[in-house]
Amino acid sequence: MSNKQITAVRGTTDWFDQAMILFNAISHKIIALSDLYTFQRIKTPVFEHAELFSRNLEHSDIVKKELYQLIDRSERKLALRPEGTASIIRAVNEHKLLDQNPWPLKLYYLEPMFRYERPQKGRMREFYQYGIELVGELDQLDYLQTILFAKKILDTFNFDCVLNINWLGNFASRKCWVEQLNQYFKQYQDQLSELSVSRLDSYGVLRILDDKNESKKDFVRSAPTIDQFISLEEQTQFKQLLEQLDQLGIKYKYNSSLVRGLDYYSELVFEFILANNDQAQSTLIGGGCYQNLIAELTNKPLKAIGFALSIERFISYLDDKTKDSLINQDQKPRYLLINLVPNKELATLNLSQELINHNYQVYYQHKLNKVDKAIKYALRAKFTHLIIMGNDEWSKQTMTIKDLSSQTQQTIKYKEFIK
């Protein structure tokens, strides 16, 4: 039998101590905001039929390079969920949620996702993604509300971000654009990376535009842009949206190279990127509109808009002040309970349960019966207070409570403590 230590799989994380506190604090705040914006939570399975992703994201890196696939005992091709939207819309259609609820349908999720990619700061193979989907007969005010919600999340965690925005047009406009891009980039095939060459003759050609290396090349910067192909009506629509952002006081940057990494986007796409940060993974929230995915999975001519964020990436870019605030916010006292009197073990155990029933965080450590050792244990285990039960406490129905931060203590009647 091998003695080699088994460790976590590369690209995954064990959550504990302060990291777990941060994860919970961020999650709780975002969920609370979701409630304020009247979104309802939805959970979908961790794995789906692989076709759900291969059919709707066939040209994306997610399917080509990053999808975790498996074949089960019944020879079915399955895949670990790489993103949330396709699964959500599959569930919406399967359970007829659009028929049973008023429009727009407003859903959010917070789930683990899986992508086989090189682990780096803010990007893991297993990561927790929060996202929203707004589905129905949408208009520009729905788009604006979605952007405002995303901005509200970022403001809550004191992130200074720049909104990057682009308009990809409808399916017909985008198809013409993709055809022109393919013709254009074939002229420079010898100057493209192997990955970019593999993206030619498909919708994947769009990814050349926002590739971190290719986008620095002059001929890529001079490539045809979508505004040369969208209709006058769409140009007017986008212009109105930008004017409305101005009226709302939302600063933005028009980025004609912004395409996002998923095939189903059309019309509006956007990203909130950390200001004054040139790191590759500095996008904190990304999203956009989509219609073809809705039509493909529900057979309804509707629109949807959504965005997503990674909890891990949020944590990696939080400033120290915000981290400390999140870790210490609403932190309740944690009590270590010890008994110094023989034959009072069951009575102490019963006392611990009574305190827990009154919503106190209490642990009775029955193996400690000396105060100095109990203090050392409590400090190591991050308890804030020590409850000492000696002969006087038992006879007078009191508790001696020691504050471990100030090293002060008081003796108080049990009934007064639980009021």
From Swiss-Prot:
User: Where along the sequence do coiled-coil regions lie?
Assistant: none
- The UniProt entry lists the main location of this chain as cytoplasm
The keyword Nucleotide-binding is assigned to this record = yes
One Pfam family from the UniProt entry?
A: HGTP_anticodon
Keywords on record: Aminoacyl-tRNA synthetase, ATP-binding, Cytoplasm, Ligase, Nucleotide-binding, Protein biosynthesis
Annotated GO molecular function terms are: ATP binding; histidine-tRNA ligase activity
GO CC terms, sorted: cytoplasm
Organism superkingdom:
Bacteria
Q: Give its E.C. classification number.
A: 6.1.1.21
Q: Write down the chemical reaction(s) this protein catalyses.
A: tRNA(His) + L-histidine + ATP = L-histidyl-tRNA(His) + AMP + diphosphate + H(+)
| Any one of the GO BP annotations | histidyl-tRNA aminoacylation
InterPro entries recorded? aa-tRNA-synth_II (IPR006195), aa-tRNA-synth_II/BPL/LPL (IPR045864), Anticodon-bd (IPR004154), Anticodon-bd_dom_sf (IPR036621), His-tRNA-ligase (IPR015807), HisRS-like_core (IPR041715), HisRS/HisZ (IPR004516)
Q: Which compartments does it reside in?
A: Cytoplasm
Q: Assembly and partners?
A: Homodimer.
The family database entries (NCBIfam families) matched by this protein are listed as: hisS
Record-stated family: Belongs to the class-II aminoacyl-tRNA synthetase family.
Q: Which HAMAP family match?
A: His_tRNA_synth
Q: What is this protein called?
A: Histidine--tRNA ligase
